[in-house]
Amino acid sequence: MSLTDTSPTRRPAVLFALILLAWATSSPHPAVAQTSAEGDQTPARLLAAAKSWGYQLHKFDPDTLAASPYDMLVIDYSRDGKPARALTPEEVDKIRVKPDGERRIVLAYLSIGVAQTYRYYWKWYWGWVFGVLSPRWLGSENPEWRGNYGVRYWHEGWQKIILGGENSYLERIVKAGFDGVYLDGVDEYVDMVKEKRNARALMIAFVKAIAERARVLKPGFLVVPQNAEALLADASYRAVIDGIGKEDLLFGDDVSQQPNDPKSIVSDVVRLKLLTADHKPVFVVEYLDAPQEIERARRRLERYSFIPYFTDRALDSMRVGDVPAPDHAADKK
């Protein structure tokens, strides 16, 4: 039933949703309170002040990334997921400088709820013979994304891979010089509730452990999860993260380019605005091709004070032309 339904049984819920959405669109840009100190270049303040971002995980070139205009980039730590082709600290430093000489934030993609077969940690025999040779933490393969396996992320074996020492995934990223991590697979807790009743709490604890370990290694290290916006209801979770990424907010939550259900959008926006109320940014990626849809989506996302980016779902190219003009932020006030 649409949000315009005025039947007596629906009217209170609809009115409440519209009030919440009005609040969501009236909140100030999260960067306002975060950038009061002139010239402050801490990673958290730079992230909060970002007006644009880009997202590419495959087929990237450091020179092309460095030439992009975005205030924040999310990339893989390696060209192919393996150490031999990992970006060097020198390459990361180059990417961190925009063409105009200004500093930008560079986050490394890190999947903490899904194991991927092209990663350095993967053993060729995992998943074979009905999984009898697989570690206990390895779940089933996602039929829609071949080579991606859900994980029991609370298991010591998986957590050791992610944050368990100098050869851990996290430490490789820190040593390469990234400003932070962009955590994917956080929403895996939804599927794991059937195995662990406290799967939600265990995921929050895992994200907190990653943040704590990373900031011991590198003070000010940024932690930005993707999706799982329902976790934002937990104030302690919001306190430990520096922002959030959200896929398919307006379009394509069924992996199409069709508009999402209006009620679902309202619900997600209200959750995401919990973070902007804490003066932390929300980065939205929409996988759209049609210029008219992109422009409409951009205007709507900017009304929410979210930072939009538009690209292909394969994430194997960097689109340009989505960067606002210098005075663009003023248009949103």
PLM feature segments, named:
Residues 2-15:
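Bacterial N-terminal signal peptides that target proteins for export
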Residues 9-10, 28, 103, 145:
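Short, intrinsically disordered low-complexity segments
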Residues 15-27:
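Bacterial N-terminal signal peptides
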Residues 26-34:
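Signal peptide processing junction and immediate N-terminal pro/mature segment
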Residues 34-333:
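Glycan-processing catalytic domains of CAZymes
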